[in-house]
Design a protein with these regions (language model features):
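Active-site loop segments of alpha/beta catalytic cores
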Residues: 1-169
Length: 169
């Protein structure tokens, strides 16, 4: 039953994208616009070859995330999110994945998404493990824990926190 619901949602998104195309509503989005969750869309790879001034999906960035499935196993995440998101992302030129969900244990599958250029690493994620898995395959877009900035100010602690994440990445 859940797969049926996901199929309906996927078809709905595909129809929406097709409608945007038909109405000429697509715009090239590679000029530093905010992209998804915590990224910008700088790229000299888009628009793709053959661009004639009318944006196609292959000329655009797209993104997906699965915060709602943050607590499910990697196997369930692959079956109930990535399987559908993969098909939605396929026609786009570059893609990003993630928001505030910890993808540490799910990156093996996430990194197989088409045209993946950026992965969001949540505050709760193991930055070192994520960096090891991501390597130089795409951009690691880390979101620091905002709670580190509230309460008693400790510049040394904050510098150490940021330095350790930077070293890991």
């Amino acid at each position: 039953m859940l797969h049926r619901a996901m199929e309906i949602l996927e078809r709905g998104h595909q129809a929406l994208i097709a409608r945007y195309q038909a109405l000429g509503l697509l715009q090239v989005n590679n000029d530093g616009e905010y992209h998804s969750s915590g990224g910008v869309s700088y790229s000299d790879e888009l628009p793709a070859a053959g661009y004639d001034g009318t944006p196609r999906l292959c000329d655009l960035w797209a993104s997906a995330e699965s915060q709602e499935l943050a607590q499910v196993s990697p196997r369930m995440h692959a079956a109930f999110a990535l399987a559908y998101e993969r098909r939605l992302l396929e026609p786009f030129g570059l893609t990003g994945y993630g928001c505030c969900e910890d993808l540490t244990l799910k990156l093996q599958d996430v990194l197989t998404l088409p045209h993946l250029r950026r992965v969001s690493v949540a505050p709760t994620a193991d930055v070192a493990r994520c960096a090891e898995q991501i390597g130089r395959r795409c951009i690691l877009s880390w979101k620091p824990q905002p709670a580190q900035l509230v309460g008693q100010w400790d510049e040394g602690m904050l510098r150490g926190y940021l330095h350790s994440a930077r070293q890991a990445a």
